[in-house]
């Protein structure tokens, strides 16, 4: 009897457990079926990826929808109840965009650094130029020990100011100096004197061939005068020396400045008072020509 009662109680308990399962709503059963179908679909998709890698791009995900209406996600994963979501790091253009941004930032930083270094170098060069200019303008100043820029050396190469060059142009160097008390004569007179064959070049105190008659007449002045000519005396102050281009000395008598004729012809056609009046050495110092060019300087003086 005890065994029969225990068997009846176990059957009643089993029946009570099966009763709630049979009383479940059809919605729960449909949801459970969808879950099982989804699991089966994922299993088949996984099998496709493992055994058929070339067909992995055809993977579609079955997502449960609203009111037991599932949908497929061709790209991405199930997101919410009606959409498909994809993470940014899963997109190829996401990484491309970041790569472009990083490269552009590096280029900008490199150009900024180069521009900064160039500006610093220009500023240093400008400061060095200013220091050199002030040192050259104000003369030698205190130079720090071990300085690579010697301002005292640069002051020697200071160019003149623009106003000084415009208003005071550079003058040629002075000509050969002469002894005091001897007036200057122009190079044109010496050139005319040599072109008329009134004098010739002699080195170291030789006599002039053109005035040989006057030189020979000098001894006769103490005795009798020559026939046909009045005694003419050439004063020592009316003869001068002229330096030639071959480092020689040419002795020339002073020509007549008014007519431009040699002194020999003037003596032959004029008297002694006329020669003294028209002699350029007897003229006042104001009427004497200006200083000749360098290298043709000459002076009236005694013959050495």
Curated annotation (Swiss-Prot):
Biased composition (Polar residues): 209-218
Effect of mutating residue 162 to A: Abolishes interaction with NEDD4
Sequence motif: PPxY motif 1, positions: 159-162
Record InterPro entries: WBP1-like (IPR021684), WW_domain-binding (IPR051994)
Signal peptide: none
Transmembrane segments: none
Region called Disordered, residue ranges: 1-26, 206-235, 252-304
UniProt entry keywords in alphabetical sequence: Repeat
Sequence motif: PPxY motif 2, positions: 172-176
Pfam families noted in UniProt: WBP-1
GO molecular function: WW domain binding
PANTHER family (UniProt xref): VESICULAR, OVEREXPRESSED IN CANCER, PROSURVIVAL PROTEIN 1 (PTHR16209), WW DOMAIN-BINDING PROTEIN 1 (PTHR16209:SF5)
Domain comment (free text): The PPxY motif 2 mediates interaction with WWOX. Both PPxY motifs mediate interaction with NEDD4.
Subunit comment: Binds to the WW domain of YAP1, WWP1 and WWP2. Interacts with WWOX. Interacts with NEDD4.
Protein's recorded name: WW domain-binding protein 1
Organism of provenance: Mus musculus
Gene: Wbp1
